[in-house]
């Protein structure tokens, strides 16, 4: 079973400000509650250490992430691979007529171990709330 979730956020901020957050692998990882820690290796790759509260997994999982598409300041797509799951995330920014922007987010998780997909199915909405909250906080803080 594959879990797919999409959600769009609206911001009263210029696309470049939203791009500054969403194109930053460190900020994306930091917004996700199950990411215990992470290392950014270069502009395209990072390792997320993910703790999933499911019986089959008793330690953190190393998820090797790589940006596979980047079209500044409009779109970034990444793929994360681990022994427990594969995740694809895509973020696309479009400017709105009022000078703000819309951020479309899509995530797909393919689980390799029992319980992984069920966990993400139950928790994806909360994780997207976390991402939106972190982005809004970033936009509200002074540069």
Task: Identify the residue ranges that each predicted region occupies.
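Hydrophobic/aromatic beta-strand elements that line small-molecule binding cavities or substrate pockets
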Residues: 7, 35-36, 62-69, 80, ...
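Beta-strand/loop substructures that line and gate deep hydrophobic ligand-binding cavities in soluble
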Residues: 79-133
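Short amphipathic alpha-helical signal-transduction/dimerization elements
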Residues: 26, 124, 128-143
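Hydrophobic ligand-binding cavity/cleft-lining segments
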Residues: 1-45
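Glycine-rich portal/gate segments that line the openings of hydrophobic small-molecule binding cavities
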Residues: 39-82, 134, 138-142
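Intrinsic-disorder/low-complexity, polar/charged segments enriched in Ser/Thr/Lys/Arg/Asp/Glu/Gln
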Residues: 2-8, 33, 45, 62, ...
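A short, structured loop/turn motif at beta-sheet edges
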Residues: 15, 40-43, 68-73, 92-102
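Hydrophobic pocket/interface hotspot
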Residues: 18-22, 28, 46-48, 67, ...
């Amino acid at each position: 079973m594959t879990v797919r979730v999409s959600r769009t956020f609206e911001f009263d901020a210029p696309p470049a400000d939203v791009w500054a957050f969403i194109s930053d692998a460190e900020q994306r990882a930091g917004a996700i509650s199950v990411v215990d820690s992470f290392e950014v290796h270069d502009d395209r790759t990072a390792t997320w250490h993910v703790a999933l509260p499911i019986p089959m997994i008793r330690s953190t999982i190393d998820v090797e992430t790589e940006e596979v598409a980047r079209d500044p300041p409009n779109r970034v797509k990444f793929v994360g691979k681990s022994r427990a799951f594969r995740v694809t995330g895509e973020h696309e920014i479009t400017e709105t007529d009022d000078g703000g922007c819309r951020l479309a987010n899509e995530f797909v998780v393919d689980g390799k171990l029992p319980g992984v997909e069920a966990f993400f199915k139950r928790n994806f909405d909360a994780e997207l709330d976390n991402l939106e909250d972190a982005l809004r906080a970033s936009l509200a803080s002074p540069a």
